[in-house]
A protein has these predicted regions:
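Non-heme Fe(II) oxygenase catalytic core, chiefly the N-lobe of the double-stranded beta-helix
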Residues: 41-42, 122, 127-130, 139-376, ...
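C-terminal catalytic subdomain
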Residues: 407, 422-426, 440
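Double-stranded beta-helix
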Residues: 428-452
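Fe(II)/2-oxoglutarate
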Residues: 2-129, 159
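Hydrophobic beta-strand signal
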Residues: 134, 401-402, 424
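Short, charged beta-turn/beta-strand-edge "cap" motif at the junction between a beta-strand
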Residues: 402-409, 413
């Protein structure tokens, strides 16, 4: 068993949760998770983050013919879908150019005090457009540096049992519940920030089983990355499954407006939580495939890290990029253009070069059991070579959050002088499925297995 050098803080018991939303307001965790609807998840094999990101070059194995049938099922109106595709491509022209010109100015930095009193209308508009935000000043710098020192001591005390990736020189540590991590997850500034960010989501279905102002604790890993090139690179991707976005009926309903075709994609609401609650993100039960619903992914900085120092990269474009990613599998480059496109820069972006194809079973960038890869070949219209930008400099204690659908990556090289370190701490609400996840997370923790 891993050794912990200090006594852990007392954590509150699993009492009934009473949030501002209906659904869970009158039910305890026990009442929710004992239903047949939320049977225990199967125990996953142990693995590392490296295995999860193996397909980020965009190469995918062939899909069986049933996936062509799935495309036909989703495309109810060919003309409407073609109209939506052309409209999305047109808007992408201006949106990608804006990011190419402004760079990481598109990534908003706000002081913690703004979060405490509520963001302004202008700030909210920017956040919902870009899907990413840095919160500064909530955690004192020395406190965050103390967490990092505690993590180093924990690693040293358990050296023979520590796992991670790369295996010979670990950067991503498969450690989930050290003292420092629990202290960070329960820090008042993090909880307050998460409550606010979760409150930006809403329900479209009455009596939805969710409390959007009740954050729960999700056990995630941390990273301590020394200067130098990365052994493996986390290229551009979207977390929360890949082919599941289309294959799982509940997950597919999230993009209902986009798949309707025509101009309905403009009505897609990236902050409607209702259709996401029953979505299955891990149909293939893969190691390190997250099965909890995280509206906001996030990390808390443990170092001074800026562009070029192994930091996060994002595509600061939320709903428009999502609409494109959802529509992309239904279209292919016309044969006369495909034969001439020997490199990503040769791929024509004009709508007339693309054609609706429902006979092709392929889903570009998708691999069962992996994350959704985004490359210049699989998704050329996003122009990720110019639009995926490194976030501005962060200091120890700064919080970074990005929408669950946002395209993001990690810099391949770390050219700074010190380590680039973060604790991964997302904003996760109390829902019925997430309540069941907490039950299973507790069980796997007690058995010494990774989180489900």
């Amino acid at each position: 068993m891993l050794r912990i050098s200090k006594t852990l803080p007392r954590i509150g018991r699993g009492l009934p949760i009473r949030g501002p939303s209906v659904g869970l307001a009158v039910r305890s965790f026990a009442q929710v998770v004992q239903t047949q609807k939320h049977a225990r998840r199967a125990t996953k094999q142990e693995g590392t983050v490296a295995e999860f990101f193996e397909n980020l070059d965009g190469e995918s194995p062939p899909f069986p013919p049933r996936f062509a049938d799935l495309k036909k099922e989703m495309c109810a109106d060919r003309g409407a879908m073609e109209h939506a595709w052309r409209a999305v491509l047109k808007e992408l022209e201006d949106a990608t150019e804006e990011i190419a010109q402004r760079g990481n100015e598109m990534v908003m930095r706000v002081p913690y005090e703004d979060v405490q009193r509520g963001l302004s209308e202008e700030q909210l508009k920017m956040l919902k457009k870009t899907g990413v935000m840095i919160v500064t000043g909530g955690v004192p710098e020395q406190e965050a540096l103390g967490w990092k020192q505690s993590l180093r001591e924990y690693i040293a005390a358990n050296q023979e049992k520590v796992k991670g990736a790369p295996s010979d020189k670990i950067v991503f540590y498969e450690i989930y519940n050290s003292q420092a991590q629990i202290l960070a997850r329960t820090h008042p500034a993090l909880i307050a920030t998460q409550k606010y960010l979760l409150s930006l989501w809403h329900t479209s279905v009455p009596d939805t089983g969710v409390s959007v102002r009740t954050p729960i604790s999700y056990s995630d890993r941390f990273r301590i990355r020394p200067p130098g090139p990365s052994v493996f690179t986390l290229g551009a991707h979207v977390d929360g499954g890949s082919i599941e976005r289309w294959e799982d009926p509940a997950f597919r309903s999230v993009w209902k407006r986009v798949l309707e075709g025509g101009d309905a994609w403009k009505l897609y609401d990236a902050f409607d939580i209702s259709p996401r609650l029953d979505a299955i993100q891990d149909l293939y039960n893969a190691p390190n495939q997250c099965s909890i619903f995280r509206p906001w992914q996030g990390w808390t900085a443990l170092s001074h890290t800026g562009p070029g120092e192994g930091t996060l990269r994002v595509l600061p474009m939320l709903s428009l990029a999502t609409a494109y990613i959802v529509l992309r599998p239904f279209f292919r480059l016309r044969s006369e253009y495909a034969s001439k496109a020997s490199s990503p820069t040769d791929i024509p972006l004009q709508a007339d070069a693309w054609v609706l194809d429902l006979e092709n079973p392929e889903f570009p960038g998708s691999t069962p059991g992996k994350t959704q890869a985004i490359t210049p070949v699989t998704h050329p219209h996003l122009r990720i070579d110019k639009t995926v930008v490194s976030i501005p400099r962060v200091n120890p204690g700064d919080q970074v959050y990005w929408h669950t659908d946002l395209v993001h990556a990690v810099e391949a090289d770390h050219n700074g002088a010190g380590d680039s370190s973060v604790m991964y701490i997302p904003a996760v609400p109390l829902t019925e499925r997430n309540a069941a996840y907490l039950r299973d997370q507790r069980d796997t923790f007690l058995k010494g297995y990774p989180s489900p």
